[in-house]
Amino acid sequence: MQQALELALDRAEYVIESARQRPPKRKYLSSGRKSVFQKLYDLYIEECEKEPEVKKLRRNVNLLEKLVMQETLSCLVVNLYPGNEGYSLMLRGKNGSDSETIRLPYEEGELLEYLDAEELPPILVDLLEKSQVNIFHCGCVIAEIRDYRQSSNMKSPGYQSRHILLRPTMQTLICDVHSITSDNHKWTQEDKLLLESQLILATAEPLCLDPSIAVTCTANRLLYNKQKMNTRPMKRCFKRYSRSSLNRQQDLSHCPPPPQLRLLDFLQKRKERKAGQHYDLKISKAGNCVDMWKRSPCNLAIPSEVDVEKYAKVEKSIKSDDSQPTVWPAHDVKDDYVFECEAGTQYQKTKLTILQSLGDPLYYGKIQPCKADEESDSQMSPSHSSTDDHSNWFIIGSKTDAERVVNQYQELVQNEAKCPVKMSHSSSGSASLSQVSPGKETDQTETVSVQSSVLGKGVKHRPPPIKLPSSSGNSSSGNYFTPQQTSSFLKSPTPPPSSKPSSIPRKSSVDLNQVSMLSPAALSPASSSQRTTATQVMANSAGLNFINVVGSVCGAQALMSGSNPMLGCNTGAITPAGINLSGLLPSGGLLPNALPSAMQAASQAGVPFGLKNTSSLRPLNLLQLPGGSLIFNTLQQQQQQLSQFTPQQPQQPTTCSPQQPGEQGSEQGSTSQEQALSAQQAAVINLTGVGSFMQSQAAVLSQLGSAENRPEQSLPQQRFQLSSAFQQQQQQIQQLRFLQHQMAMAAAAAQTAQLHHHRHTGSQSKSKMKRGTPTTPKF
């Protein structure tokens, strides 16, 4: 079957090509009148016999135009006008002049569709029959299409003409039957059917009854060659650029697009905008361009001298404000800068607030849009606002930094708005804004992390800060330290002796997740190898203040001594062999009148204390307890005292004996000095005397020692009883007990260092045993 079909297609191609080159001649009756089809066939044979004037061109085309010119046949004229003028129909009269009968717009394209299909429109049958000139030729009508749309001269427009033969269809035959039978004669239904059959036979083309499949293939090939450019996809493309379609698009462009076509409208406008851009691209002439592929490498000689001053740009460096003295304000200072601008139709108004709280040398800033309730928001300082408002304030620094922030923000607003910016400034100050109620100060939990730069060379990375749970049980205080919280711990009427007092509140932080860093042994009973009588301090409801001193102490020894100031420390500079804690805390004592006079006298006497052999020291933890003692505690004692950490009833504080230093020197014997030098003992130091703290407080230094705990040293243990306030805070105590696991892990990590210092500590103790009366250790 496939082979037969291929043979039929080849036969069809051969028949078409032979008929085109050598068409056969037909014989007609001599007495008969030739039809328009016979005339076209004879003209086709005549043109095929002639030699073409130009090779590869055929003459047997445009036969209908040649026939009209030879015989001057009457035809129907269709004019296609440019723009929105539409099209019209014209009929030729007896005098030879053409008269326009119908003029229609392009939107009514039904008549044009019949002309495109070369079919006789049924609506024109009655009009054409009533014309003065007979334009029918064997039932067909010759139409001349005059196209004025391609003419460039509108004054005397020319046109392109082509002829088509409109053939009758079944609809036109029905119209003919109806017009013939509409006279006064009576036509039966059988007569009408007989008339219709005769009309179909007279107008139908001759049939080919050859059963070969090649006949069908030939007919299909001829029809395809005739309608190859008249398919539905081609018609759809042509209609897209037709006049009716362009008019519809122009009308819709003035109307708002529907919601479904907003994206399409946006893309269309962007496409038109990009198409309208003209680029000035100049193509250089041949020979003027540089061939990048064949260009030789450029070898430039290095100049011997370069004028640096000609190309250099001098930029002034920003000087640090460390040399400027820190000013502790006596009341709150708040500056409001309001920036107003009108960019187009939008009015923008923002406010920059610069705030300096009482007792805090740092400046804080806040940027917010101006609203109706801006007055209520501006009355809240960073230290008294809610925890949700902490994120709105940011640390600026010194006064010079605050001025720089104002200038930079003004330039930023002016650059974004691209219009003049109006700035108004208002300043206000009130000392009542920074006062803290007693209840709030009690509930606060303060954590200060001091960098290792205070102690010399230490670790590079700061360990995570420690957060103690507040007495109220509220965990919302886990935000960063506010200026008021910092100033409550470092509050002093005079500038502190530290060279950088602002380094503590800048790097302060609170983290509730790091509560496990605090050793529970810091709250356990303190013990001392010197048999020092530990003062039982009554703890009040004040919060716990904790300072984490990061990094190890540099140097071979660390000496801390002094008189009246806190921790018995000097206010001098930090020497390579010692640590000065006066830079950590403000000058002045801790307990103004909270402890007995005996303890005050003992602390005012200025008993020095020393820490030697600091190569085995670990980061120090300074815990400020609501009491009056300073406890140095080590890892081994913390583990022994962990089981004894139970809340007890508060007891009255007892005073230390003035003969305590001498008593220690007599009873300790030859081992007192090496015990004082080791990191395994606990010493109690009374903190009394001057200070500006509102409540009686103490500090606990918890040191993780790395020396080996020798069995011959039995350290007496003493209970450090807490008040009933801690008994009510069971949640705090449970959280502190969870640190046992982490302390055990720290002890395991210190075993390597303990083995390293075992021989050194043994030889040192033997050498000191041979000496005379040991010196009194300093506290």
From Swiss-Prot:
Residues 445-454 have a biased composition (Polar residues). Residues 424-437, 470-479 have a biased composition (Low complexity). Keywords: Autophagy, Developmental protein, Gastrulation, Nucleus, Phosphoprotein. Highly expressed in testis, moderately in brain and pituitary gland. Expressed in several fetal tissues, including lung, brain, thymus and kidney. Expression is down-regulated in malignant prostate tissues. It is found in: Nucleus. Required for MAP kinase p38 (MAPK11, MAPK12, MAPK13 and/or MAPK14) activation during gastrulation. Required for down-regulation of E-cadherin during gastrulation by regulating E-cadherin protein level downstream from NCK-interacting kinase (NIK) and independently of the regulation of transcription by FGF signaling and Snail. Required for starvation-induced ATG9A trafficking during autophagy. Pfam families: Spt20_SEP. The modification Phosphothreonine is found at residue 494. Belongs to the SPT20 family. The keyword Phosphoprotein applies. This is Transcription factor SPT20 homolog. The modification Phosphoserine is found at residues 296, 519, 524. Signal peptide: none annotated. Residues 373-392, 420-507, 641-677, 755-779 are annotated as: Disordered. GO terms for molecular function: transcription coregulator activity. InterPro entries: Spt20, Spt20-like_SEP. Interacts with MAPK14. Interacts with ATG9A. It comes from Homo sapiens (Human). It comes from the Eukaryota. Residues 755-771 have a biased composition (Basic residues). One of its GO terms (cellular component) is nucleus. One of its GO terms (biological process) is regulation of DNA repair.
